[in-house]
From Swiss-Prot:
Keywords: Cytoplasm, DNA damage, DNA recombination, DNA repair, DNA-binding, Endonuclease, Hydrolase, Magnesium, Metal-binding, Nuclease. Homodimer which binds Holliday junction (HJ) DNA. The HJ becomes 2-fold symmetrical on binding to RuvC with unstacked arms; it has a different conformation from HJ DNA in complex with RuvA. In the full resolvosome a probable DNA-RuvA(4)-RuvB(12)-RuvC(2) complex forms which resolves the HJ. The active site is at residues 7, 66, 139. Its EC number is 3.1.21.10. InterPro entries: RNaseH-like_sf, RNaseH_sf, X-over_junc_endoDNase_Mg_BS, X-over_junc_endoDNase_RuvC. This is Crossover junction endodeoxyribonuclease RuvC. PROSITE patterns: RUVC (PS01321). It is found in: Cytoplasm. GO terms for molecular function: crossover junction DNA endonuclease activity; DNA binding; magnesium ion binding. The gene is ruvC.
Length: 154
């Protein structure tokens, strides 16, 4: 079973495809959907086109996405909500449903500590998947952690 994990952002969107076969987990691909334009509507189009490519290039079975977190800047929250809405619609059109996990749930699932740092999550992601090289930026590690969180619940 291939699971797509998505860490939505307003500048980049981390993604990871993890394959679960019984108890075995394997990282198939991870990266960023990079947003190049500064115009919101065009950013949303770039994001959804990036998702389209992932859907077409991989036989994805399930999708998991990080739930919104609290931010101090209301403009950031509104912009992120617009991105999440577009991402959610694209996923629903393609798959009919998806799972959402809060940052606390992801940290708890991957590290055993809901207050873990991003660096601790990155360390455990590498360890759980037996990845030797550095995974950067942390948006990618977060997306992998989201996919792993979903895999644990299957």
């Amino acid at each position: 079973m291939k699971i797509l994990g998505i860490d939505p952002g307003t500048r980049n969107c981390g993604y990871a495809i993890v394959e679960k076969n019984g108890r075995d987990l394997k990282l198939i691909e991870a990266g960023l959907i990079k947003i190049k334009t500064k115009i919101l509507q065009e950013q949303i189009v770039e994001m959804t086109e990036g998702l389209d490519l992932l859907f077409k290039n991989h036989k994805i079975d399930q999708v998991s996405i990080e739930d919104m977190f609290y931010a101090f800047n209301p403009k950031t929250v509104i912009k992120l909500a617009q991105f999440r809405g577009a991402i959610s619609l694209k996923i629903l059109q393609e798959f009919g449903n998806f799972s959402e996990y809060t940052p606390l749930q992801v940290k708890q699932a991957v590290t055993g500590n809901g207050k873990a740092t991003k660096e601790q999550v990155a360390f455990m992601v590498k360890r759980l998947l037996n990845v030797k090289k550095e995974i950067k930026p942390l948006d990618i590690t977060d997306a992998i952690a989201i996919a792993l969180t979903h895999a644990q619940r299957l």
